[in-house]
Amino acid sequence: MNSLANNGKLYLSLKKLNFPKEWSYPVNPNTSYIIDTFKEAVKCGIFLESNKKHFEYSYSILTVIGWFFPRYNYEQLMIASSVMQWIFVLDDFLERDHIDDEKQQYCVNKCEDILIQGRKSEYISNIADADLAPLDKYTLLLRDRLSKSTKDRVETFNIFIHYLREWFFSVIPLKKSKGESKSDSVHYDVYTFIRTVNVGLYFVIAINNVAVDLKIDGSFWMNPIWSRMTRNASRLFTIVNDCVSYAKEIDQECAGENCLYILQIKSNLPLQTVYNHLVDEFDQIVAKVQKDEILLLESFNYLPNEKIDGIKYLILSLKELLVGNYKWSLVSPRYIHKDSPFIETSRSDSSTIPYETILTPDIFWI
């Protein structure tokens, strides 16, 4: 792989991906949600409490919540962490090579229907509680938590479910887009279009709509300036995530879903040149987000302060997510790899967990 410079020395740094200095946010000091979220998944049968690797898997996922939502209280953190744990478990399941197309599609359709209808879903309505598959139990738990938080705000619940289902319906198309061979790569523009949804920023920012009573109209989520901001922010998410996962995805022969690899193959350029191109794009997109922040607030200057405050909360949260994702990615064991071309994530660590091998289908799916 073209990840090392001459003599095997690392030559790339993720510090070239810069955010404005004023975008500096602390990590949420509350960490009690981590063990509580893990225990809920254990109760549903997703994990085994006695299995150390299961806890490490869960812990590595849930730590991101503290980086994403530094202002959340415990109850809000529990909402966000249950969403994130559900997402990662489902994503890791769908990306397994031994899960055929039919089972993947069945899984997606089933999750969608349970989120929409709950216990009335035709997939589980005739199954006793004790006989439900672990992931079904956890999906019901998640839906119940979301419903309780939005019991007087049905519109906000529907908006969040919309973004959530958009995400999990993007997983299979992205996987299929690269062709039959694992090393194939999709056209870059096609990849960017699918990955904008698949990277997950839309549903992550929409967690605020469930966890926080923002006092804003549902129509705000369709505002073209806000839509452009979140689309551009999704691109920033993608660049960071693809950089830190580059070596791992090449190692697992699934780099056809990685923007660095796609640009290398399609443009026949060395990794360093491709990375410099992405750094330039990153800087340009950050500037666009800053410009749209001003435009967005100006376009709503007629609203009462209560609603303006809700919009300002979301804008700040968007920036917290961007910075939090970047900082978390640099320290998460999920992205450590001995062949990483980036100094910050390249090392051999005996404690690093091969996440793709931890959860077997019989543990969390029947």
Swiss-Prot record:
Motif DDxx(x)D/E motif boundaries: 91-96
Enzymatic reactions: (2E,6E)-farnesyl diphosphate = (1S,2S,4R)-beta-elemene + diphosphate
Sequence motif NDxxSxxxD/E motif, residues: 241-249
Keywords assigned: Lyase, Metal-binding
Gene3D superfamilies assigned: Farnesyl Diphosphate Synthase (1.10.600.10)
Enzyme Commission code(s) on record: 4.2.3.-
Disulfide bond residue pairs: none
Database matches in InterPro entries: Isoprenoid_synthase_dom_sf (IPR008949), Terpene_cyclase-like_2 (IPR034686)
Top-level taxonomic group: Eukaryota
GO terms classed as biological process: terpene biosynthetic process
One Gene Ontology molecular-function label: metal ion binding
Catalytic EC class: lyase
Pfam family, one: Terpene_syn_C_2
Domain comment quoted from the record: Contains several highly conserved motifs that are important for catalytic activity including the aspartate-rich 'DDxx(x)D/E' motif and the 'NDxxSxxxD/E' motif, both of which are involved in complexing metal ions to coordinate the binding of the isoprenyl diphosphate substrate in the active site.
Family: Belongs to the terpene synthase family.
Its job: Terpene synthase that converts its substrate farnesyl diphosphate (FPP) into the sesquiterpenes bicycloelemene, beta-elemene and 2 yet unidentified sesquiterpenes.
Protein name (database record): Terpene synthase 4
Name of the coding gene: TPS4
